[in-house]
Design a protein with these regions (language model features):
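Membrane-spanning beta-strand positions in outer-membrane beta-barrel proteins
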Residues: 37, 163-165
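A short, acidic, flexible beta-alpha connecting loop/helix-capping segment that sits on the rim
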Residues: 170-174
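C-terminal outer-membrane beta-barrel translocator/porin domains of Gram-negative envelope proteins
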Residues: 1-121, 125-129, 133-136, 142, ...
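Short amphipathic alpha-helical surface patches that serve as generic macromolecular interface elements
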Residues: 103, 148-152, 163, 184
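A short alpha/beta connector and helix-capping loop motif
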Residues: 138-155
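Exposed loop/turn and edge beta-strand positions of beta-sandwich/beta-sheet ligand-binding modules
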Residues: 20, 149, 181
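Outer-membrane beta-barrel "beta-signal"
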Residues: 155-162, 180-191
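Active-site scaffold segments
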Residues: 124, 152-158, 165-167
Length: 191
């Protein structure tokens, strides 16, 4: 069994931007046999403006996509600001994320068929649950607070430049305004 915990805190009290931001991440891998592994990733994030200041938009959390809730377009979960160019066209909304996030990923990892003992090419099945939350304002419409969920399968290759992942996804809990993707590709991280 391998596990890791990451805790990060930011505090800004100087200048015109005053805020606190805290992140927590926990990952654990359980070998089920020599060939199969079950993995879990949990993340929580919280940000708040201090001294009457708003939480900075550039520090917002963004959810959706590989590395988050797969099956949703990258960075589309959370608050939206209606486009000033086409205010009635929901497809033109600007995604602004939110100051709170929740994410749970679970994966069953297995060797790719026909590769023998090569552990660099693997396949996985997954279920993801999560969302990004915001505080509504006159310029930001916070999307539904309901958790989003997806499932799917994919392949990963531990290449010389880092992990490459390709996933086929199906959102299983979504809202009408959510932007979804069936196929997603990622370079970089395990989840």
């Amino acid at each position: 069994t391998e596990f890791g915990i990451r805790i990060n805190t930011e505090l800004s009290i100087a200048g015109g931007t005053r805020y606190v931001k805290a992140d927590y991440q926990f990952q654990q891998y359980w070998p089920l046999s020599k060939r199969y592994t079950f993995a879990v990733n949990t993340e929580f994030g919280y940000g708040k403006g201090l001294g009457g200041k708003s939480f900075p938009l550039l520090k917002n959390y963004f959810g959706g996509g590989l590395g988050s809730v797969r099956g949703f377009e990258q960075g589309t979960l959370g608050g939206v600001s209606p486009s000033s160019i086409a205010p009635t066209d929901r497809a033109q909304d600007i995604r602004v994320g939110g100051n709170r996030s929740l994410l749970l990923n679970s994966e069953l990892i297995a060797p790719f068929p026909g590769v023998g003992n090569d552990r660099t090419l693997r396949m996985f099945a997954f279920v993801d649950v999560g969302n990004v939350y915001c505080t509504a304002s006159t310029t930001v419409n916070c999307a539904s607070n309901a958790l989003r969920a997806s499932s799917g399968f994919g392949i990963s290759w531990l290449s010389p430049v880092g992990p490459l992942r390709l996933a086929y996804t199906t959102p299983i809990k979504k809202e009408v305004t959510d932007r979804t993707q069936k196929i997603q590709f990622q370079i970089g991280t395990a989840f």
